[in-house]
Design a protein with these regions (language model features):
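C-terminal end-helix/capping segment
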Residues: 84-100
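Short S/T/G/P-rich N-terminal loop/turn motif that feeds into the first structured element of a domain
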Residues: 1-72, 96-100
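A short linear hydrophobic-aromatic micro-motif
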Residues: 34-36, 80, 90-94
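C-terminal structural segments of small proteins and small subunits
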Residues: 67-89
Length: 100
């Protein structure tokens, strides 16, 4: 079993967000994580959140514990602080669950 997060973002700076992805992916892979799906969304038909969403993706980890370790990793937090906060207006957690 693996652990999957489904996320929705409102990306406001595509170039800066791409830099974030390029820098964080090696860290993500070092934890055994990866992106399963990644979509740019042009229209949201229904949402439980008031946040705008223009990007939807899944991010997969070997376990919830590994996911938690990744998101608290100092190297990841430095990349997030440098690129993510200036490129994303809002974050919507759509779902977290065990996956086959």
């Amino acid at each position: 079993m693996s652990f999957e997060r489904i996320m929705g973002l409102d990306v406001i700076n595509d170039e800066e967000y791409q830099r974030y992805r390029e820098c964080m992916i090696p860290i993500l892979k070092s934890f055994g994580g990866n992106f399963g799906f990644d979509f740019k969304v042009s229209e949201v038909l229904k949402s439980k959140s008031d946040n705008a969403i223009n990007r939807v993706f899944t991010i997969d980890f070997p376990s919830k514990e590994v996911m938690d370790a990744f998101f608290s990793d100092q190297s990841y937090l430095e990349v997030k602080n440098q690129y993510f906060k200036n490129s994303v207006k809002s974050v919507t957690l759509i779902s977290m669950h065990e996956a086959n």
